[in-house]
Amino acid sequence: CLENQRSLCESHVTDCVPFYELLEVLAEEVAVSTFVNRVCRLTGRRNLCFFQNGHRERFMAMGEKCSRAIEEAATCSAVYLLSADRFLWSRALEVIDQEEIHFSKIHIHGVDLDGYVLFHMARDLYQGSRHVRLSELTDPELVSDRIFEWIMTACVIRRHGIRVLREEERRIDRSRIGQ
């Protein structure tokens, strides 16, 4: 019963709290200074870019194909990361269905370092595995700021579900109208 109350409470909080504040809460929970510092630099910009270079279109197309599966936080967060990289997406597209993501069928040969990190982080968020270490995430030579931003977005999606993206897009649309 308490778990149901927590979920309901988190649902209301997620719909009200700006995305960057959800990232700050995540950073506080991790409490490793290099991670906190990197998240703080990210949230200091306050204009996070959720989608660019066809990412939104690839993500939304999968949402239409697998509308039921994309509502699950684990699937949504993994699809968000897999669709961020055009080459990785071309490898993953055919192995995602209404039931699951078949990571063992995704052949990542030829993917660059960014795609490699996105693939393994997507698998970790989806399966609950731990292939990507925190020390790797905090190293800007291994994980670029753009990839780190997408990974942090996926972590918040994993925790709060697709409604985080929907609410943030509404917030962005409202700010554009107000300009």
Summary of predicted features, one role per range:
Residues 1-111, 127-179:
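Extended, charge-biased low-complexity segments
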